Structures are given as structure tokens and as C-alpha cells.
Amino acid sequence: MLGSKKKYIVNGNSGIKAQIQFADQKQEFNKRPTKIGRRSLSRSISQSSTDSYSSAASYTDSSDDETSPRDKQQKNSKGSSDFCVKNIKQAEFGRREIEIAEQEMPALMALRKRAQGEKPLAGAKIVGCTHITAQTAVLMETLGALGAQCRWAACNIYSTLNEVAAALAESGFPVFAWKGESEDDFWWCIDRCVNVEGWQPNMILDDGGDLTHWIYKKYPNMFKKIKGIVEESVTGVHRLYQLSKAGKLCVPAMNVNDSVTKQKFDNLYCCRESILDGLKRTTDMMFGGKQVVVCGYGEVGKGCCAALKAMGSIVYVTEIDPICALQACMDGFRLVKLNEVIRQVDIVITCTGNKNVVTREHLDRMKNSCIVCNIGHSNTEIDVASLRTPELTWERVRSQVDHVIWPDGKRIVLLAEGRLLNLSCSTVPTFVLSITATTQALALIELYNAPEGRYKQDVYLLPKKMDEYVASLHLPTFDAHLTELTDEQAKYLGLNKNGPFKPNYYRY
């Protein structure tokens, strides 16, 4: 599949160009003291997506050692200090985590085995900004096996598993990330990945668009050598489309978020399992009979609603799109406006990708002990900033769980400060992440090896053939056997026997 230099051709006209405008406002970050005299790197940066995506299962919490990693002098066993992690001594534990993840990521391991002899990414210098977990480590090491040099930072302040970052640093990957970064730390880590003497990236792998945004703001000349951008999240994709619409996108970009393998597997199945895991670990709540409102009925919302319904919850849905709204109704959920149920629900979950979905007015009207959380990428969906006022008291009851108390004694339970719930408070299924990570790897290979002129300065969707290939790599895990078309059947349908089997407009 990867042996030919001729790669997949993406239909440049198939991208979804609908724009969702986000206000250019700075997000709320975890407030942590930084060393006096440090120059803030973040003052000119807006619209950050440093939402929470950390694991409750992490070997160490960020509070274990209050000394900032930036103030430590650390070296790995090879003598390299080109990294900044919480504690390099955690590398052995992190290596075990990575080895466990490899067992549930069959497609990436198969891709590593099939393509490492060819080295399709030889000469690639990839700078990445994603969630640094064991699954990401498997992706990074696969990219390295395929010939790429990588430098990596975390795409949000809570996502990093410290032991995994240490294991990557011990293996020689320049990683700049730790759990519980401050705002200044976040941008400093990204800058350390990008601003390196004698090393300049030629590929970007982003999740949320912050890395791309930083390079545009601080080092625009770097785009002269960058061949392309691969973006995973809805937030980052919207930012790319906005750049393209304004005529400011100067390199080709691949939209992984809207690929079939991301939308229908990562967004749906991942959230269907991890929403319950995150809520259980943080609240110990029984879901049977509880009233829940889910804001948004996209693939993430569908997964959340299905999981909660199966547990016996009474689920309401809010939605702006009449098509998604009709789907919710026919799936057995009651469609409401948030104001209609806000006084009675026990749990509020946002998954829209928009801003101020839950406002201070909504928060004021919630019942006592209502649980409020977000499982969309951005941390803008819940107006957490409006809760940071003198009349309200914040009480940290456990990691990633805050009680916000009103003067009359009413309290709400806010999870992960309104940031991404599932890996802030739990984990996500490794097998599902294998699907997304394989898609990212193939997108990087495609853009890096594409002949000049194949891709213009625009945002492209993955080709159907690539989606089908990713899916096929995961089928052996289930001992699944695909039916093959006969020549007569293929001719009747007008298809190639080897695919693609669906047109680009097909909705799975």
C-alpha cells in the first residue's frame, strides 16, 4: 500500500466549508505561579484551546513536586537535555504504559512493520502539539520508525501523562510537556519545540490549532519550508477553514477530524465509553433515573446519549441543527431548550464546540449539587470565568472536581474546570485511538510525499480509500472476514473491486 510513490489524491472540493465563528478571547488557564522575571509568551495569542485532557490514572499528579520542570536540570541516560518533563526518573513506568498501549493499537504496529523498511517519512521533521498519552507515544515512535524526526508539546495544560513524557524523553524524543502547566508554561513548551537552532520543521501535526497559530504569529517564515498541516480537532479545523477563507493559509492542510474513521469511531465510540468512566470516577454517581441534558447531538453527543440511556438515565438533548435534532427525536430523546430543563436536571454535559453554551444565568438556576461538565474539545462551552467572582466560593474536593458554592449554600459540581472531561477525569479506549492515530500517520505520509502541485493552499478531506485502509487494518482484531465483490457485481455497481466502495458524499 505504501510502497508506491504515488499517494492518495484528495478531492479538494469535498471539504465542509461551513464556518463557526469563535471570538478571539483568551481562555481561562490553571493559575499557577511562575518564576518572577519570566517573559510571558502568551500575550499576543488568542483563542487558545488548552482545555483539560489529562488522566486520573496518571502515575503522578502535578502537585507531587512544586518545583517547575523549567527550573530543573535533567538529562536522559544518553546525556541529552533537549526535553522538559516533570521527572525523567519516571521513564521506566512510562515505558510499561506504552508497551501496554501497543497491544491495543494493531493498525499502528502493522503500519510500523510494513513501512519502516521503506522509510516513507525519511527527512520529515514533524513538530507536534497533541495530547501526550501512551497512545500518542505509540504514534510518535511509529513516526520515528518511518524515518521522521519529531519534537512534541502538549495541546492543553492537563493532558500529559508525566511518566509517558519521561519515557519519550528517555528514548530521545524532544518532549516539552507536563501535567498542570501554567499558561506561560504552555506557550513556552510550544516555543521550545519550534524555535530550535539548526532544526526547522517541515510538517505540523496539530490538535486544536495552537501550534499552527503560534507559528503564524511568531515565525511566519517557517511556512516556506513546511509541506503541510495535519489537524485532528474540530476547533483546529475551524481555525484552518477561517484562514483559508481569509486567504491566509499558505500551505496545504489535511482535515482529519471530518474523516469517517475519526467521526464515526473516535468521536462516537470513544465518547460512548469514556463519558461514563469520567463521571463515575469523579462523582461515584448512579445513573439510573438521573435526569441529564446533553448539549449537542453530533457524533460526540450521540455517543454520550446512548451510554447514559443504556444506564437508565432520562436524557434530554439541545440542538441548533434541525437534522441532528430530528435524529435525537427518532432515537428516543426529548429535544428541549436548555432553559426549559435547567432547574430539574442532575447533570449538564456540553459537546458542541461552541462558546457560552452554559451561561452564568443557567448556572445560577441549576439545582443544588448539579454536575456540570464538558466533553467537547474547547474549554469555552461553559462560562467558567463568570463563576470567578467574590460572592462565590470554590472548594476543591478532589483532583479535577470543584464545588462552586453560592451565598445561600447551593453548590454545583464542576468537573475539570469546564475542560475536556474524559481524559481529565478518566481514560479513553486505546483501540479507538489507534484508528485516529493511524489516520494521522497516513495523512502525514500523504502530504509529505505528495508531488508539488497536487495540493494547493487549502484544507482537504482524507480520501475514502485511506479511510477504508485504516478500517481494514483493524478488522483482524475481531477475526472479521470481508465479503469480496465478483467481477459481475463490481461492474454492476460501477466500482473497483478493491475500493473505494462509497462515494465522497455518502453518509455512514
Swiss-Prot record:
Transmembrane segments: none annotated. InterPro entries: Adenosylhomocyst_ase-like_sf, Adenosylhomocysteinase-like, Ado_hCys_hydrolase_NAD-bd, NAD(P)-bd_dom_sf, S-Ado-L-homoCys_hydrolase_CS. Its EC number is 3.13.2.1. Its main location: cytoplasm. Pfam families: AdoHcyase, AdoHcyase_NAD. Keywords: Cytoplasm, Endoplasmic reticulum, Hydrolase, Microsome, NAD, One-carbon metabolism, Phosphoprotein. Residues 24-81 are annotated as: Disordered. GO terms for molecular function: adenosylhomocysteinase activity. Its cofactor is NAD(+). Residues 42-61 have a biased composition (Low complexity). It catalyses: S-adenosyl-L-homocysteine + H2O = L-homocysteine + adenosine. GO terms for cellular component: cytosol; endoplasmic reticulum. Residues 32-41 have a biased composition (Basic residues). Binds 1 NAD(+) per subunit. GO terms for biological process: one-carbon metabolic process; S-adenosylmethionine cycle. Pathway: Amino-acid biosynthesis; L-homocysteine biosynthesis; L-homocysteine from S-adenosyl-L-homocysteine: step 1/1. NCBIfam families: ahcY, PRK05476.2-3. May regulate the electrogenic sodium/bicarbonate cotransporter SLC4A4 activity and Mg(2+)-sensitivity. On the contrary of its homolog AHCYL1, does not regulate ITPR1 sensitivity to inositol 1,4,5-trisphosphate. PANTHER family: ADENOSYLHOMOCYSTEINASE, ADENOSYLHOMOCYSTEINASE 3. Homotetramer. Forms heteromultimers with AHCYL1 (via the C-terminal region). Interacts with ITPR1; with lower affinity than AHCYL1 and maybe via ITPR1. Interacts with SLC4A4. Interacts with ZCCHC4. This is Putative adenosylhomocysteinase 3. The lineage of its organism: Eukaryota, Metazoa, Chordata, Craniata, Vertebrata. The gene is AHCYL2.
